[in-house]
Amino acid sequence: FALKWPNDVLLDGKKVCGILTELSAEIEKINYVIVGIGLNVHQKPGDFPPELRERALSLKMATGRFFRRAELLRKILAHYEELYFAYLEQGFPMVLQVWRELNCTLGKEVSVTTTEGSFRGTALELSEGGCLLVRKASGEIVKIMAGDVTLCCDYFDN
């Protein structure tokens, strides 16, 4: 699997999972983070709207297997807890390293939509804070903190 910045999990180049977060913070303190995970488990191709069928996938479609949702949840939460404790010990650089290793956005042509508009460019790197750095055709490098980023081609292509 691979991660598409900032919050999509891809399997075989198709979205199988999305992760959303809500954060309450002050300048030097995070009050709380709420994490929502949407995972396509048993959908069949016909369960997706026609416009998503080429871009979406379920675990069952990818593997042909049936998954017990409670067991999936247990494994996800155990892995989440493992990463959380590693973060507490090692800090955000550890998270950033894992994110970079699994990322399929970097080096790819992307279409970016933010509250300030839309543009195309090349995804260069994740900043130390986790922002996506994108080079526009003009050469300007833009730091994306939030927005919709779409890969312009299949991420398996070179």
Protein language model regions, located:
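General beta-strand structural signal in soluble alpha/beta enzymes
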Residues: 1-5
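Long, positively charged amphipathic alpha-helical accessory segments at protein N-termini or as interdomain linkers
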Residues: 11-158
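Conserved active-site carboxylates
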Residues: 8
